[in-house]
């Protein structure tokens, strides 16, 4: 199947793409910035400009079996101004209308149109249990979401199956609400809004991408579909579960009046109560991987397969320039990560050997950008790229120190933030036709004792998160 996706470089899209690729789908992504998307979405995807040539857009739609429309500017955590509301509408309603119009002009239009929506369509219903037949609300968010859905439903007139995906709060450590909440909770101070009695309908990111594929393959599913886990919780309960996995010491309520001063009308995203159940998914037989919140959070914050320690061995393939760093006395650290995937080693090696796939399995908050990379890659190849954490940009140059096709390769930093960085990638065949991917990184920070303090307080923690995300995307791509 060929899938056409909008919003591909967003939080959900960056998980959906590797998952659909693992099922054999080919993908075209319509994006606002092709250069940026190329650094985020990997080498195995076709990119077009969503606001470029209408002929190119229509040609892409003509060859597509399915459209997944995920486009939409971020609503939560921003102040709603007149300008922002215009952006919300244009990126949702107007873009959907434009897609629908182009599809109606196709000679061989897609058979299925899945369009993102939100449980915000129901309005503030407090403790009322909601399913897909519940009435919609009357506030701005409900009306916006209703217009968004109605734009998609125009395709029903053309015998195209339409599903609108009423998403709850999507959970993944490196995106969405958990990315925003985690720093404070991990520093020991959690919070919830108001008295915490508002219901939160949530869903784990893995279940989102699985449910999208399920809707694609199940012809009986049509119309609105609640993308929420079966067990919604209150905001206070959510904070309590998050405290348990992050070891936060204190949870304090934040008066909603304070947030209203910050976000204006946008506070309703945080204070409205939605106790929405996935009735249509459950009745059709969909099985959730994460049906309770504790299970979902424990999975997201688990780092058991990534370990960092002081290096107690000499560096592999030590060069003259770096041999003086060998051994534990030199404050060299070793990161070790292992993942087993259902894929052959040759294909796996090719995937990781392409520099253009790096951005796909790098967290979005690193703002990864390739500056220079020439293929084919081999021993001695040089790559230049840039990462940006907050306001701090860091240029990085590596060269391939060792290259053994389909087995291993090692890259070494020649310019960048580390005094030493050597990353060995091992791709190993297993007897059961799976593949083990091993990452072994030796690294050292500059600035002596200050570097060691920075490592203990921050760097070790960030590296574990980065490689943990890498493994999660790997498991989606090669499930």
PLM-predicted stretches and their roles:
Residues 3-23:
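N-terminal Rossmann NAD(P)H-binding glycine-rich loop of SDR-like oxidoreductase domains
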Residues 35, 39-95:
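NAD(P)H-binding glycine-rich loop region in Rossmannoid oxidoreductase-like domains
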Residues 85-87, 97-139:
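Conserved Rossmann-fold NAD(P)-dependent oxidoreductase catalytic core, especially the SDR/UDP-sugar
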Residues 90, 126-164:
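Catalytic helix-loop patch of NAD(P)-dependent Rossmann-fold dehydrogenases
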Residues 146, 155-164, 168-199:
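NAD(P)-dependent short-chain dehydrogenase/reductase
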Residues 182-190, 198-232:
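Alpha-helical substrate-binding/gating segment
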Residues 218-265, 298, 304-315:
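Mid/C-terminal beta-alpha module of Rossmann-like enzyme folds, strongest
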Residues 305-374, 378:
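Hydrophobic ligand-binding cavity/cleft-lining segments
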């Amino acid at each position: 199947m060929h899938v056409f996706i909008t919003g591909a470089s967003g939080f959900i899209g960056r998980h959906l793409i590797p998952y659909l690729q693992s099922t054999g789908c080919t993908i075209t992504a319509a994006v606002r910035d092709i250069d940026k998307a190329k650094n985020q979405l990997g080498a195995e995807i076709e990119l077009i400009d969503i606001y470029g040539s209408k002929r190119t857009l229509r040609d892409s739609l003509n060859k597509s079996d399915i459209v997944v429309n995920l486009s939409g500017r971020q609503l939560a955590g921003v102040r709603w101004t007149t300008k922002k509301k215009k952006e919300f509408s244009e990126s949702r309603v107007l873009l959907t209308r434009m897609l629908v119009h182009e599809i109606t002009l196709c000679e061989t239009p897609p058979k299925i149109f899945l369009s993102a929506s939100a449980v915000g369509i129901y309005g503030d219903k407090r403790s009322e249990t909601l399913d897909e037949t519940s009435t919609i609300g009357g506030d701005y968010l409900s009306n916006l979401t209703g217009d968004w859905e109605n734009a998609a439903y125009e395709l029903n007139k053309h015998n195209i199956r339409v599903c609108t995906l009423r998403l709850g709060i999507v959970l993944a450590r490196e995106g969405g609400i958990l990315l925003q909440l985690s720093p404070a909770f991990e520093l020991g101070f959690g919070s919830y809004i108001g008295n915490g009695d508002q219901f939160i309908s949530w869903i784990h990111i893995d279940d989102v991408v699985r449910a999208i594929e399920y809707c694609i393959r199940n012809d009986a599913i049509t119309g609105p579909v609640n993308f929420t886990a079966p067990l919604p919780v209150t905001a206070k309960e959510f904070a309590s579960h998050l405290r348990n996995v992050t070891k936060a010491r204190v949870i304090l309520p934040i008066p909603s009046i304070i947030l209203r001063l910050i976000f204006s009308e946008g506070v309703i995203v945080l204070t409205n109560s939605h106790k929405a159940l996935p009735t249509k998914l459950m009745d059709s037989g969909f099985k959730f991987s994460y049906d309770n919140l504790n299970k979902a959070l424990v999975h997201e914050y688990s780092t058991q397969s990534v370990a960092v320690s002081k290096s107690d061995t000499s560096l592999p393939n030590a060069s003259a320039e770096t041999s003086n760093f060998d051994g534990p006395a030199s404050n060299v650290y070793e990161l070790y990560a292992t993942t087993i995937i259902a894929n052959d080693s040759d294909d796996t090696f090719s995937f990781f050997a392409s520099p253009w796939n790096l951005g796909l399995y790098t967290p979005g908050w690193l703002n990864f950008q390739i500056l220079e990379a020439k293929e084919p890659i081999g021993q001695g190849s040089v790559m230049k790229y840039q990462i940006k954490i907050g306001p701090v940009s860091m240029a990085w140059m590596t060269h391939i120190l060792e290259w053994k096709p389909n087995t291993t390769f090692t890259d070494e930093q020649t310019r960048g933030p580390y005094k030493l960085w050597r990353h060995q990638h091992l791709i190993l065949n297993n007897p059961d036709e799976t593949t083990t991917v091993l990452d072994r990184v030796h690294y050292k920070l500059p600035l002596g004792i200050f570097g060691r303090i920075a490592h203990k307080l921050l760097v070790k923690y960030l590296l574990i998160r980065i490689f943990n995300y890498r493994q999660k995307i790997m498991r989606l791509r090669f499930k």
